[in-house]
Amino acid sequence: MAFRMKLVVCIVLLSTLAVMSSADVYKGGGGGRYGGGRYGGGGGYGGGLGGGGLGGGGLGGGKGLGGGGLGGGGLGGGGLGGGGLGGGKGLGGGGLGGGGLGGGGLGGGGLGGGKGLGGGGLGGGGLGGGRGGGYGGGGGYGGGYGGGYGGGKYKG
């Protein structure tokens, strides 16, 4: 009797796994409540190819805390610590093309920079933004127009 019960439980578990794999994993979907998935899918709070969710990401990013991957995603765009090629918006954005909180994000930047707290990178930015320039340029605290290699004007 105990053996039959174990056999039934095993069959149920295997069939459940098979359904989950066909429905989620191979369609790029979930894989857990707070993230996962074979193709970068979120799960729980996101899902799909390039999903999202808490700790999501993958190709195309998606939305949710901790997004990212190619094309950004996350909380408003880049997510907490997001970024990737194309950046996006949200705390900690960045990557190629900038993004982040208002542009560069907290510590953001990347090629093309942008505006926001701690911007910079190639094309600069900075706290309050402005238009950055050069390698690590930027307007400094409050903006202005940056230029040269790390140069730029400082406007308090």
From Swiss-Prot:
Subcellular location: Secreted
Lysine amide modified-residue sites: 155
Keywords: Amidation, Antibiotic, Antimicrobial, Fungicide, Immunity, Innate immunity, Secreted, Signal
Organ and tissue specificity: Expressed in hemocytes and secreted into the plasma following bacterial immune challenge.
Entry's Gene Ontology cellular component terms: extracellular region
Chief localisation class: secreted
Entry protein name: Acanthoscurrin-1
Organism field: Acanthoscurria gomesiana (Tarantula spider)
